[in-house]
Amino acid sequence: MVDRRTFFRGAGLTAAAIFGTGLLGACSSAVDEQRAGAATGASGAPVRGGTLKTGIPADVIPATFLTNTSGATTVIGLAYDTLVRYPHDKVEPQPRLAKSWQLAADGLSLSLELRDDVTFHSGRPFTSKDAEFSLRTYADPKWTAQLRSTAAAITAFDSSDPHRLVLTLAHPLGNVFDLLDTVPILDSESIDKLAAGDAFIGTGPFKLVSRTPNSALVFERNEHYWIPDRPFLDRVEVSVIPDSQALLSSLKSGQVAVAGGLNYRDTETLGETAGFQAVSLEGAELQVYVGANVTHPALADVRVRQAIAYAIDRDRVISEVFRGSGYPVNLPWPKSSPAYDEARNTTFTRDATKARAILAGSGIAVPTLPLTYQAGNPFYEATAQIVQANLAEIGIPVELDPQEGATFIKALIGGTIPALWVTFHSWAQYVPSTLTISAYPFNALKNSSHYESPAYVDAAGAAWRVTDGTGAEAKDRYRAVSDQLLDGLFLVEIGVVLNQLAAAQRVQGIDWTKRSEIVYTDTYLA
């Protein structure tokens, strides 16, 4: 079993530092209020008003606002809108700020009809020039946005009509609607303040009214939101609580009513406890994996990476760390993906004997390898411990290397992690070409592993350049991509996992995007 000290280390001190002596005094009244609210909400009718208090493990990092990091997803979900939005269970765009569209038969242009009743939090009307600005900004390398390649394939914009935007594309883009689902509509007049972390002005259901870096964000209802009578809530207060046990204590005591970033065991327990609920973010799957820097002398040989792939106990990671909320895979695609392939997902199953034989056949004496992960995250640390034990079993010594969150993200983006790492990736729940064209770990042209392969570049490019990203032609091309991933093995997939929230039962109407941006537009306190 996973060492439970992983999940509790330092919790008491951190909780005391955050809550001080007021924690115990507030505990009983807050819990009583929570239970009373749950009973009142039995009718199921939405209730207007109230303040929702939530907890997240990390603050927004302005420089990585467009990279799908956890703090940014909180702000985007509350304060921003996109042109389209995918439903949870498929990649079929639904109207948001774009109310309709027409993709040319040759896939080389896309015309978007935009809403004319939308304003920014500043009061300025939203027009096609704002949509153009947002897409151009997303393509700017300084923001290191993961779908930048797709945004950069837009070669021309026609925003002459304030309520119509026409995009000219360099070639057919099977994932163009992934881009439109992802890019938040940004305010050109305050973009410098966004970069500094001083203002986050969007068109979303809530507007940011205050931010204390690494501590708290406060949002109030956007009274001029384009969806009538929404949002229901008056206010959302977000506390940044990096320690998972302090966050758990805060939820149990009623200091917050929604918490993201708890370990799966605690979320599972809360889901079985009166007054609480566990919310699985269906359609926003994450993948946990081991990455390898192939410029490391020992990891340059694919046979060493194959040995690692055979050594990892995927079933144990899914069952112990994620409490069965997921399933083992060899490839990144979730079961809902048009690229999912059951047969290819059994290529590497745990076989320590075979792993040792492959390692011996390589003739490489593998030195101690650092295994880097984001410190303070219980999923990563527990997974890293299992991987460390698995690799020790086949003769590969591993030293755990926890890094502070911003440092880890910078190293991942910059490709400076020295050997192995454990983290999540996303984007596989989208049109499959998005992953191999865009995501840092997978990008065929430049990735975090420094893996280079003309065959992989060709396969990824061919899968991208299709008009219909879910059609038969695309699926054939995705199989070629999957084969390249298994052959190169610069990333060793462990499993698909469902992101989860824990919440008080009285919090109803929680929604989310495919990027795990939590959406409180329809949320109310019962």
Identify the function of each model-found stretch.
Residues 224-269, 397:
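Ligand-site clamp/hinge motif
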